[in-house]
Amino acid sequence: MITKIDKNKVRMKRHARVRSKLAGTTERPRLNVYRSNKHIYAQVIDDVKGVTLAQASTQDKNLGLETTSNVEAAAKVGEAVAKLAVEKGVKAVVFDRGGYLFHGRVKALADAARENGLEF
């Protein structure tokens, strides 16, 4: 009998493997990405203090998005989180793709964050 592979369980294992080697510091916090079917979320986290420094998502009303599950929306989120992080004095981050492939919405968010002042 063939069992169906749970994609999210595989992603969680991949994310745990990556997180064991990756941590955000005070000088270089972690830019974490979570992607659902409808939304994308990004936050800049200082793992030493356990504090979120900046966050943005497609659920934010001030972004004024018509659709929340496409590449353009992800780019707006990347732009917003980068601007908030730069305002807080964060220039360099460690990118945590959350176990997702660096493609599509995740890549669009990362590229927009780079264009708006974050280095990774």
From Swiss-Prot:
Coiled-coil residue windows: none
Record's protein name: Large ribosomal subunit protein uL18
Subunit structure: Part of the 50S ribosomal subunit; part of the 5S rRNA/L5/L18/L25 subcomplex. Contacts the 5S and 23S rRNAs.
Cellular component per GO, a single term: cytosolic large ribosomal subunit
UniProt record, GO biological process: translation
UniProt similarity note: Belongs to the universal ribosomal protein uL18 family.
Keywords, alphabetical: Ribonucleoprotein, Ribosomal protein, RNA-binding, rRNA-binding
HAMAP family, per the entry: Ribosomal_uL18_B (MF_01337_B)
A molecular-function term among this protein's GO annotations: structural constituent of ribosome
Covalent S-S links between cysteines: none
InterPro entries in the record: Ribosomal_uL18_bac-type, Ribosomal_uL18_bac/euk
Function according to Swiss-Prot or TrEMBL: This is one of the proteins that bind and probably mediate the attachment of the 5S RNA into the large ribosomal subunit, where it forms part of the central protuberance.
Domain of life: Bacteria
